[in-house]
């Protein structure tokens, strides 16, 4: 006989665990099912090289929402943020730019390249932060459906519009961010390519876009919306990114949450238009009237459900939902940290740059995208080297270090050859760039883990290895994420919900889709009990 729960969560990533923890706190008997042998999804810490613990996929803490941290009491369960330094951007010719929370410090760095750009930076920061403040409010909203004409939907849309009535002319600032390229947006403020590249760099992180791609300006804002104090809101987590998901899981377990690993879901069961449970690949069944899927919308709707039972327009929308990925991750165990020629501790004001961007100009970033656009890996990739072991002594042996390299572009599909035969070429391209700024770094490598988009897809199930479960473009955001009419975390199957990064507000280790989905689940449950 199938074991019964009040709610089942498919996928033990941070959003699934967050949703499950909130439901457990509300008194629901809740089960989380994870395909892998370890909980965490893209927020995991694993010992791939003996003695070295890698944050295998996600690598920096920024977007985890303060409400999730507080409600789930994560600090009680081992969650501790360690500071990242100001962002250090080495440039050719042994120069550099510093991008810091301290506006005056950033201005001083900019002023060595352009007095005009330095002078206008505080105005730009205030202008961008106005939009960020609006987006931070939108994070916790359930997107209404403005196209629906029933009274309930009309009231929800009217309530939403009234709530944000004071946005006024700032609406046009948001439209600019949603539609303009990063280069065009930044060129309205800055003149030097090196300075524009400091911010435009974010527009390519995790997305198949370059700084000249329409809509790429929004991705800058997505990455700076975090409310954690630090360089642009960035920090490390003691014990690696897996410490976040372990803390969420433990918080849930204290309230009765059940988490099971090595449980691959094969199908979501339904009867009479209502969710009734799940079936695993080994035939095991679990029953529940509430099922929340933390996996990609493509898997939820196109693999776990019978498409014939879904509205044809939803199937078409999900089939065309863009998930093509060009992100790679290389985790390195090494004898020593990269020693950047352009870094001077006295001049920079900190001991070592734990957070670095290699992508010196707009043109460099666009060339990296151009290679991928035509089906090849970037010959000169942009790279984010982060060095958590400089501040975290729990992840590497004494005197040794962990360096995480995230970057782009490495297309899921290559025009010539495949990743099985060309992965070493990617490594060479990446290390050539690192060694160009930090000579001799590659000589001290002890071991590494190389993840291309197909590797990421195989390990955590995100289609095409997309780290956000789908592109962050205007047609795939808010009331269109993952599809029009189904952005409120619900689905055409009553009792089946979406709680992962395919839902609003998208990817990043933030916990917001899980939080929002749990709120809607509990709201529906309360409504049903009154009927």
Model-derived features: positions:
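A conserved FAD-binding loop/helix module that cradles the flavin
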Residues: 501-522
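A conserved beta-strand/loop element that lines the FAD pocket in flavoprotein oxidoreductases
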Residues: 251-265
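Helix-rich C-terminal "cap"/substrate-channel and partner-interaction subdomain
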Residues: 123-156, 381-479
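Extreme N-terminal leader/targeting segments of oxidoreductases
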Residues: 1-7, 25-26, 229, 477-491, ...
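Active-site/ligand-binding neighborhood in enzyme catalytic cores
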Residues: 129-255, 462-477
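N-terminal glycine-rich phosphate/pyrophosphate-binding loop and immediately adjacent elements
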Residues: 3-146
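Mid-domain catalytic core of redox enzymes
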Residues: 231, 237, 264-396
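A glycine-rich dinucleotide-binding beta-alpha-beta segment and adjacent secondary-structure elements
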Residues: 192, 196-212, 357, 375-388, ...
């Amino acid at each position: 006989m199938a074991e019964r729960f009040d709610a089942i969560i498919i996928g033990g990533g941070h959003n699934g665990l967050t949703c499950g923890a909130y439901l457990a706190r509300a008194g629901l008997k809740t089960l989380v099912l994870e395909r892998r042998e370890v909980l965490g999804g893209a927020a995991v810490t694993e010992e791939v090289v003996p003695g070295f613990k890698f944050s295998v996929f996600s690598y920096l803490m920024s977007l985890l929402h303060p409400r999730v941290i507080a409600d789930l009491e994560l600090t009680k369960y081992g969650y501790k943020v360690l500071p990242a330094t100001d962002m250090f951007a080495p440039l050719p010719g042994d120069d550099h730019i510093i991008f810091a929370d301290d506006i005056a410090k950033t201005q001083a760095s900019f002023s060595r390249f352009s007095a005009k750009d330095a002078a206008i930076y505080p105005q730009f920061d205030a202008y961008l932060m106005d939009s960020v403040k609006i987006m931070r409010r939108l994070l916790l909203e359930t997107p209404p459906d403005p196209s629906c004409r029933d009274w309930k939907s009309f009231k929800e849309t009217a309530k939403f519009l009234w709530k944000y009535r004071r946005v006024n002319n700032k609406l046009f600032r948001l439209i600019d961010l949603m539609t303009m390229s990063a280069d065009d947006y930044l060129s309205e403020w800055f003149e030097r390519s090196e300075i524009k590249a400091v911010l435009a760099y974010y527009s390519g992180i995790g997305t198949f876009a370059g700084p000249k791609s329409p809509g790429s300006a929004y991705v800058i804002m997505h990455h700076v919306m975090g409310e954690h104090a630090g360089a642009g809101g960035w920090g490390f987590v003691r014990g690696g990114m897996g410490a976040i998901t372990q803390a969420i899981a433990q918080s849930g377990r204290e309230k009765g949450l059940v988490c099971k690993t090595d449980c691959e879901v094969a199908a979501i069961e339904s009867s009479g238009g209502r969710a009734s449970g799940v079936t695993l690949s080994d035939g095991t069944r679990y029953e529940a009237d509430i099922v929340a899927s933390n996996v990609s919308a493509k898997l939820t709707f196109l693999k776990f459900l019978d498409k014939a039972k879904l509205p044809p327009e939803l199937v078409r929308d999900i089939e065309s939902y863009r998930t093509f990925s060009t992100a790679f991750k290389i985790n390195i165990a090494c004898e020593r940290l990269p020693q950047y020629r352009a870094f001077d501790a006295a001049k920079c004001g900190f001991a070592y740059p734990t957070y670095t961007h290699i992508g010196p100009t707009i043109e460099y970033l666009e060339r990296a995208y151009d290679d991928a656009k035509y089906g090849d890996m970037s010959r000169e990739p942009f790279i984010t080297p982060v060095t958590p072991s400089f501040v975290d002594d729990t992840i590497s042996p004494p005197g040794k270090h962990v360096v995480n390299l995230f970057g782009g572009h490495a297309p899921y599909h290559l025009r010539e050859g495949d990743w099985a035969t060309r992965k070493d070429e990617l490594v060479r391209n990446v290390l050539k760039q690192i060694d160009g700024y930090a000579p001799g770094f590659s000589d001290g490598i002890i071991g590494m883990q190389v993840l291309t988009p197909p590797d990421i897809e195989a390990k955590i199930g995100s289609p095409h290895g997309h780290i956000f479960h789908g592109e962050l473009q205007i047609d795939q955001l808010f009331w269109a994420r993952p599809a029009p009419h189904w952005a409120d975390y619900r689905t055409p199957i009553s009792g089946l919900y979406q709680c992962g990064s395919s839902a609003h507000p998208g990817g990043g280790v933030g916990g917001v889709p899980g939080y929002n989905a749990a709120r809607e689940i509990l709201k529906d449950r309360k409504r049903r009990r009154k009927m």
